Amino acid sequence: MGKKRIYELAKEINVASKDILETANKKGYDLKNHMATIDDNQEKTLRAAFQTKATPAASKPATPAAPKASEKSESGKIKINKTAIRRRPEADKKPAQHSNNRPQANANRNGQASNGQNRTNNARPNNNSARPNNSRPNTNSRPNNNSQNRSTSANHPMSLQEQISQANARRQRTQERIQQQREQREADEKKRREQANRPRPTRNNASNNRPSNGKPTNGARPTTNSPRPTVTKDGRPLGSSRPNNNNSARPNTTNNRPTNSRPATTPSRPVSAQEMQQKMQANTVSASKPASNNTASKPKNFGPDKKRGGGYNSYGNSQQRFNKKRKKTRKQQLAEQNAAKKEMPQRKERPLPEVLVFSEGMNVADIAKKIHREPAEIIKKLFMLGIMVNMNQSLDKDTIELLATDYGIEAEQKVEVDIADIDSVFETEAKSDANLVSRPPVVTIMGHVDHGKTTLLDNLRNSHVTDGEAGGITQHIGAYQTKLNDRLITFLDTPGHAAFTNMRARGADITDIIILVVAADDGVMPQTIEAINHAKAAKAPIIVAVNKIDKPGANPDHVMEQLMGYGLVPEDWGGDTIFVKISAKTGENIDDLLEMVLLEADVLELKANRDQKAVGTVIEARLDKGKGPVASLLVQQGTLRIGDPIVVGNTFGRVRVMTNDRGRRVKEVFPSEPVEITGLNDVPQAADRFVVFEDEKTARAAGEERAKRALLKERSRSNPVTLDNLFETMKQGELKEVGVIIKADVQGSTEALAGSLRKIEVEGVRVNIIHEAVGAINESDVTLAAASNAIIIGFNVRPTPQAKIQADAEQVDIRLHRIIYKAIEEIEAAMKGMLEPVYEEKVTGQLTVRETYNVSKIGTIAGCIVDTGVIRRDSGVRLIRDSIVIYEGKLSSLKRFKDDVKEVKTGFECGVTIEDYNDIKIDDQIEAYVMEEVPVK
């Protein structure tokens, strides 16, 4: 059990914290304030000390022992008063009787003591003037000594001094009231003696149950025959407070009236609930018998009462209805109180954990579940520690540790694992060395364009795969399996064009062995060198296949000499690189090549664990019209099964259908086997890694988090304008843009085309790739192109009929290509066409002014001779005087003799006028030129 604080103990034993601190300090405990903690032994000691003090005080109200010497004899009344208040529920259990002489149950219900007199209604004194007339129902047994204490609230806790002072005040009021009652009784006795000789009215006792002016009648009516009895100062009929003892027609009320001459100072014994109930039953019986006789002789007084002012006494009727309702309620209360109360189920107290494992940012509700406590209790504890929180508010590390210390348990922060970091999971799973078994080698075929890579793979498939196999060789990266000597080999085919550099790099990363295909008639080419660099970067062994040895002019030795310059020395020449001379077209030496591959695989000792979760790499991805996103995967570790939750790059899903390289559906895929899967939520990027998770919920969370991070990373690429790059930004703003939307059949082609377009360099124009995706050209692509004024390039895809109609309507240019060269050339031409034309000045001829003529309305006409070249009608001219350009403008007219001509050649004379210029002099030189457009380089 944990330690307890002083304020908590004070609440439990209902003692002030200050008193507990004083007692604890007297006992030698070093406690500073109410927040100090105590152990179990100290708690027991303090509880015992305060229980010892509280025992006498608690027993005072119930003990009828003699009062102390310091108290008066009235102290017994104080105790009775307190006892009566505390026994209020027992008093409520008594049956309610509608009779003339109700006992003191009402007095107890109002929180007042009976004072040991058991006074009935017939002995009611006349001092109730402070009580409002219409405030009580039709009960004639209400005692008169509760007018002073009706508003006293006995349910509020008071201190002992306050209780003593209130008791003294009540005792003083009681003595004064008793003295008044004595005087009133003496006066009443005197009046009754005078009235004893007078005749009684005929209506004897019929109005016992009817109120008069809102006050219950006590059975004593005036003997005069007047319609209204005389009224005393307090509004009560004179003489109605006590019955006439000499009247033989009235019931024997003296049996129920106790003597009121008992001294007030006599201490009375507390009345138990059983005694009070017996007295109530006795009074009810004694009052009900005479009442039945009286009512039998005379009907009840319903209807209008002439003596009471006429009309129906609705007040009495409503009070009777109220009494019935209240009587029914009391019965129900009695039944409910007597019924066995069902015990509330107790909350099972679960023990606190030894260690609270938390993560930063947990709220109160989370902590409550971990430590098996109510959130309200934790909020209260934090409040006492000076921390205001609500149930859903996140808590920091210090607050959680402080709370754990207060509960007496240790706090340990949970190590957070980034589920979105699948690269770390991939590396961990890939390095697993348990349950290792042999796996097929993964071989990548690389080389320059048209050196025979696809032909070689086609020959391998046709030679070692059953006839009638579905599918064929594609132009994209693809994975296929072939068998030799009952051993599988997985081949990856990569494009050889320069635009597919990323594809070749991906193939080199996931491969075990690289076959470099070099044409014997072509030699080493740029993509051959690039493939060598990829292989060296991946640290994969290279097997050189010298192809096309069947062609005339083939020189394999020249190829071997060239490759020695790149570090590939043949084994025959003392190196460690395997060279195989093959012909992919005829199939020559193909089996030798496969045997070399298996030999190299044996040297590498390739193994994998089939029992773990599958991890691998995306070879290619595309969007199929019927299947949705389709990804070609290469499993590198573990076993991939249908239904596995999987995260592929920034996408996630559950494996629905798996198809192998032959087009057949499979249920599980082992390491080094290629497979096509469906069931992803989006098309992943090629070369993305995939990891299988335990459940779909975790996979979904990881995939969504990765997609979110990728989006944020994409947005952060836009460089904000700063003072450092302001000039560059302004220059870029002056550039023209060619908007392009790329749609291709596979993800790798999309990347290759986008990368090639970005490399086009035309001064003043740049390519802006607005969108690149996999799949057919649809209406949303056309809408985006129309909004951004872009060109749509489709690579091995076609537009849908709706997209084609929409493109024609919105005049969107869609260009479809199957060869990447043509797509690049077309975009380059479009970029050059966006540039403003550049013009270059070309001088066509020179003239010398021989004579000038001034003609009105025309201006000055210059008679010239063409010295060199040709002068045309649309030429621009410069007027040069003393080697200084005086004017530059256009010709207004060009004539030979009187005829307008288009041009005048060297040696001929002509007349010219210059537009808007007349200051021409003899011997001036006129230079003619034209502006010619310069083609964009």
UniProtKB/Swiss-Prot annotation:
Q: Provide the primary localization.
A: cytoplasm
**Could you tell me which residues belong to the region G4?**
547-550
Q: Where is the composition biased (Basic and acidic residues)?
A: 173-197, 339-352
Where in this protein does the record put region G5? Answer: 583-585
Which Pfam family, any one, appears in the UniProt record? IF-2
Read off the SUPFAM superfamilies from this record. Initiation factor IF2/eIF5b, domain 3, P-loop containing nucleoside triphosphate hydrolases, Translation proteins
Q: Show the segment(s) annotated as G1.
A: 447-454
Q: Which residues form the tr-type G domain?
A: 438-607
**Where does the record place the region G3?**
493-496
**Subcellular localization:** Cytoplasm
Instruction: Provide the residue positions that the database annotates as binding GTP.
Output: 447-454, 493-497, 547-550
Alphabetized UniProt keyword annotations: Cytoplasm, GTP-binding, Initiation factor, Nucleotide-binding, Protein biosynthesis
Return the Polar residues bias intervals: 97-116, 154-169, 202-229, 274-298
Q: Name the segments for region: G2.
A: 472-476
List, as start-end ranges, the regions of compositional bias called Low complexity: 52-68, 117-153, 240-269
Q: Could you tell me which residues belong to the region Disordered?
A: 47-352
State where composition is biased (Basic residues): 322-331
Q: Which GO terms describe its cellular component?
A: cytosol
Q: Which InterPro entries match?
A: EF-G-like_DII (IPR053905), IF2_II (IPR044145), IF2_N (IPR006847), P-loop_NTPase (IPR027417), Small_GTP-bd (IPR005225), T_Tr_GTP-bd_dom (IPR000795), TF_IF2_bacterial-like (IPR000178), TIF_IF2 (IPR015760)
Task: Give the protein's biological function.
Answer: One of the essential components for the initiation of protein synthesis. Protects formylmethionyl-tRNA from spontaneous hydrolysis and promotes its binding to the 30S ribosomal subunits. Also involved in the hydrolysis of GTP during the formation of the 70S ribosomal complex.
What is stated as this protein's family in its record?
A: Belongs to the TRAFAC class translation factor GTPase superfamily. Classic translation factor GTPase family. IF-2 subfamily.
Question: Known HAMAP family for this protein?
Answer: IF_2_B (MF_00100_B)
State what protein this is by name.
Translation initiation factor IF-2
What is the protein's species of origin? Latilactobacillus sakei subsp. sakei (strain 23K)
